[in-house]
Amino acid sequence: MKPVWQKYIEIINQVVKPALGCTEPIAAAYGAAVAVQELGCSVPDSLEVFVSDNLYKNSMGVFVPGTGKIGLAIAAASGAIGGNADAGLEVLAAITPEQVLQAQEMIDAGKVSVKRTVTDEFIYCCVIAKFEGRESLVKICGGHTLIVEKQLNGKINFIADESSATSTGSICEGVDINIASIYEFATQVELEKIAFILQAADLNTKLSDEGMTNSYGLEVGRTMKKSIDEGILSNDLLNKIVMETAAASDARMGGATLPAMSNLGSGNQGIAATIPVVIAAKHYKNSDEQLARALILSHLGAIYIKSHYPPLSAFCGNTVTSAAAAMAMVYLAGGSFEQSCFAIQNVISDSSGMVCDGAKASCAMKVSTSSCAAVRAFLMAMNSRSVSGQGIIAKDVEQTIINIGQMISHGMPSTDTTIINIMSA
């Protein structure tokens, strides 16, 4: 096995992992759980939560799993009272109704405050917990569970080494990686080295089934199913992919108590990287090995493309995640590497203008839009049709990825500020 392939496996294991609930409010829940653990109490006297603008934006409209409620305050209070500080992104997996009630009582009593803070970091959350005159501080920065500092009664007892950072940009820094090397790795590495990725199919399919069975959010998936049953839509590959991908997002954003296999801290993007690939594999009757290789293509491809821009921004990351999924679908359909590159080009050309205006129920619509673009792009690619040398789409896929990264990093910060100001008005 090539030495760099082991690094690829490490990257995937590091940032493709189960997450219960939207990861921005979950970061606050996790920080609060750790802060209370440091204090050694069960219910703190008070909580103060300071977050970056982007983390604030992505927590304003999304349900916190197990609570039936929205926002950072309930996330932090629930994490403090019923969170498992050792469970990372699944910190609220065992939350009980009684603990949620206690959390709400804390909020109603004015014991939980949430404030935006000025920081250059996109992912930033600082939680201060107080109990009987003692105080703990936990600072998360650069990743949703990346604790960079802990204090107890004003004394620093932990500071992370700079090398521990796992933010989007740093995850691929210094690694010899590109679309061609990802394709070679995914299609040639020994199966036993990557079979673990099949857990993504299991977790995200269960979430999709939940969204199809029960009512969550806007019911994008269930609405499509109703239209299929009524003969308005056909039950074809395109609509199956869009329907089942959207259903998983419905459930996730609606507070379902099932984890998603996330991708670089995003459950929706983990869903977008997984469900279209799973449905395509069923359609083409691919083997489990082919599915595993396709999921590696999709997840690692998405990680690589997203390494070119900030982890949270005004750009909806489901677009480029779906580009990676389209590449994987080409592989499942027996297409070539060149056609896989065509698929990426086509998706980015199609839907790269979609903005992120916070995590919420309507994210399921954006997930459905992106997955639809992925199928369309994949079908065009299989017919060797590709956008090339137009707009931000270069003739070379690697340059296109650089271009989209530049557009987001340099062209969209003011858009992000405007969106946050509108949402906060």
UniProtKB/Swiss-Prot annotation:
InterPro entries assigned to the protein according to its UniProt record, in alphabetical order: Ser_deHydtase-like_asu, UPF0597
One term of GO molecular function: L-cysteine desulfhydrase activity
Q: Might you name a Gene Ontology BP term for this protein?
A: L-cysteine catabolic process to pyruvate
Q: Which is a Pfam family this sequence falls into? A: SDH_alpha
Q: Which family does it belong to?
A: Belongs to the UPF0597 family.
Question: What's the name of the protein?
Answer: UPF0597 protein Swoo_4889
